[in-house]
């Protein structure tokens, strides 16, 4: 491999119909990938995708701070999602981490950029800090 993309999300809903093909295109272009989970479901999906490839596909598992509280998010352009509140379940993530190609645990730290207008920002910050 010539390159490695250290932060992909081919495990998300936008790629549900072509995740394997998307990963294969990267591999064909000599790009290894680390596919990053943002909550338990997408972390499971990142790990499940590993079994479809022999090498050069890895996973990081974790809980993104924007999933520590329930909300709808839209950036006005292309990103739009609805999320439920989730707490970091150490046992569940520990189990996923047993796969030999899980190379990281954690998403990206605290995220105060995507705070909903209609929620108490301090309350959300407390929820995020508690998860990490």
Where do the protein language model's features map onto the residues?
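Mid-domain alpha/beta scaffold segments of enzyme catalytic cores
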Residues: 1-132
């Amino acid at each position: 491999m010539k390159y490695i993309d250290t932060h992909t999300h081919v495990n998300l809903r936008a790629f549900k119909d072509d995740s394997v093909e998307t990963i294969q295109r990267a591999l064909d272009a000599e790009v290894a990938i680390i596919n990053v989970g943002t909550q338990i479901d997408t972390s499971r999906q990142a790990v499940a995708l590993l079994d479809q490839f022999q090498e050069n596909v890895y996973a990081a598992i974790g809980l993104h701070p924007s999933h520590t509280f329930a909300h709808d998010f839209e950036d006005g352009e292309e990103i739009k999602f609805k999320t439920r509140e989730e707490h970091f379940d150490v046992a569940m993530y520990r189990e996923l981490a047993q796969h030999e190609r899980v190379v990281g645990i954690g998403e990206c730290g605290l995220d105060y950029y995507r705070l909903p207008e209609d929620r108490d920002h301090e309350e959300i910050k407390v929820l995020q800090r508690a998860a990490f």
